[in-house]
Amino acid sequence: MSLVYMNIMTAFAVSLTGLLMYRSHLMSSLLCLEGMMLSLFVMATLMILNSHFTLASMMPIILLVFAACEAALGLSLLVMVSNTYGTDYVQNLNLLQC
């Protein structure tokens, strides 16, 4: 396994560890999710380029579209929670349930 793949897997693992450790603030959770999606995008792109599998060349673009939608929803939720409660704690999301 090449050094590039190891670095990308390490970036994914660090983002996952950050997501599991720093769960108190919504902004840090969203940043860790974006790091995970970015490393998945780069890994998928490299694998498709190395295997010369042209039929799956749209898969990284679709992944990037879903990452953008996730970021937009996450930021809108962050703005709503911070305007309502004044903080961005994840524990405030439990108060949104009916």
UniProtKB/Swiss-Prot annotation:
UniProt cross-references to Pfam families, sorted A to Z: Oxidored_q2 (PF00420)
Major subcellular site: mitochondrion
GO molecular function term, any single one: NADH dehydrogenase (ubiquinone) activity
EC number: 7.1.1.2
Subcellular location field: Mitochondrion inner membrane
GO cellular component terms, semicolon-separated: mitochondrial inner membrane; respiratory chain complex I
Task performed by this protein: Core subunit of the mitochondrial membrane respiratory chain NADH dehydrogenase (Complex I) which catalyzes electron transfer from NADH through the respiratory chain, using ubiquinone as an electron acceptor. Part of the enzyme membrane arm which is embedded in the lipid bilayer and involved in proton translocation.
Protein name: NADH-ubiquinone oxidoreductase chain 4L
Organism: Pantholops hodgsonii
Gene that specifies this protein: MT-ND4L
